[in-house]
Amino acid sequence: PVVKNNNKIPIFSAKLFYSNKTVNSFEIFEPNKYYLLNIWSSWCVPCRQEHSLLMDLAKNKNINVLGLNYKDTKINAKKFLEELGNPYKKIIFDNNGVKAIEWGAFGVPESFLIYNNKVLEKYVGPLNQDFVKKIKLLIK
């Protein structure tokens, strides 16, 4: 289900998945760009179901798909991405689940459509074709 929002994104610092570099929210989310932040885990069955939609959306130059890897291990997360592909420009590593809570997430998967440091919409559960079509229309 879609939740209308328009709240500012949380201000945070976190480690990037591959580089282990600590970054803050202002470094990740640039103004005047669309982002889809997808909270996912390798152990999450619905995350597998939505993954092909994320791979498709990642091909669109008008949006940056970012991942927040939730309560996972790097080994399992890397296997997941090697098997299904990596749609994410950047991945935030959240092995203890704290960053997801800061976003107001209750589980996985959840996705946030972001523009100018504001959450335009939050999508709870696996993405579907209808929501992805809506995103593509919005970011044209």
Regions flagged by a language model, labelled:
Residues 1-16, 136, 140:
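N-terminal targeting signals for export/organelle localization
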Residues 33-35, 39-43, 107:
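Short pre-active-site segment immediately N-terminal to redox-active cysteine/selenocysteine motifs
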